[in-house]
């Protein structure tokens, strides 16, 4: 698996599913930003939708925001044609949050299907979000 893919997948789960309590390299942050910008353009997010995505506000997502999530997940390989790529998730997310927590997330989330691939991506985001690490306490 090439380093581009590893970085992309790591950035995906941190920015969309895991939250910001993990540290990303500058390269990972840049790659995630590139994917966000490309997907925003591809699905033609409105300025209001872009603001929601940037604020990580995925409550009551529009169809465009759901398709943005699908685009992002597909760019990094965790979804392919609406199907979760479990081996990829286990290998890469496991390195970030631990194998056991990743297996628990997959057990809960693997059967999720939406009305279409965009809806599936949005529902998977919601499912994986429940496994994100608690924020670290500030001293």
Curated annotation (Swiss-Prot):
The UniProt family comment states:
Belongs to the PBP/GOBP family.
Residues linked to a glycan? 23
**Signal sequence segment:** 1-19
Disulfide bridges in this chain: 39-71, 67-118, 109-127
User: Where, per UniProt, does this protein localize?
Assistant: Secreted
Instruction: For this entry, list what GO says about its biological process.
Output: olfactory behavior; response to pheromone; sensory perception of chemical stimulus; sensory perception of smell
Which InterPro entries does this UniProt record tie to the protein?
PBP/GOBP (IPR006170), PBP_GOBP_sf (IPR036728)
One Pfam entry for this protein is: PBP_GOBP
| Gene3D superfamilies assigned | Pheromone/general odorant binding protein domain
Q: Which domain of life is it from?
A: Eukaryota
Name of the molecule in the record: General odorant-binding protein 56a
Per UniProt, what is one GO molecular function of this protein?
Answer: odorant binding
- Outcome of substituting residue 120 to S: In strain: 907A
Q: What UniProt keywords are attached to this protein's entry?
A: Disulfide bond, Glycoprotein, Olfaction, Secreted, Sensory transduction, Signal, Transport
């Amino acid at each position: 698996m090439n380093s581009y893919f590893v970085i992309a997948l790591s950035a995906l789960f941190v920015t969309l599913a895991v939250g910001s309590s993990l540290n990303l390299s500058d390269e990972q942050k840049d790659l995630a930003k590139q994917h966000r910008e490309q997907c925003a353009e591809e699905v033609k997010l409105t300025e209001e939708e872009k603001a929601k995505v940037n604020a990580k506000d995925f409550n009551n997502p529009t169809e465009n925001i759901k398709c943005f999530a699908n685009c992002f997940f597909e760019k990094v390989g965790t979804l392919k044609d609406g199907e979760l790529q479990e081996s990829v998730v286990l290998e890469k997310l496991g390195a970030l949050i631990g194998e056991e927590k990743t297996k628990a997330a997959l057990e809960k989330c693997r059967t999720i299907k939406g009305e279409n691939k965009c809806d599936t991506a949005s529902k998977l985001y919601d499912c994986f979000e429940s496994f994100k690490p608690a924020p670290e306490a500030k001293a």
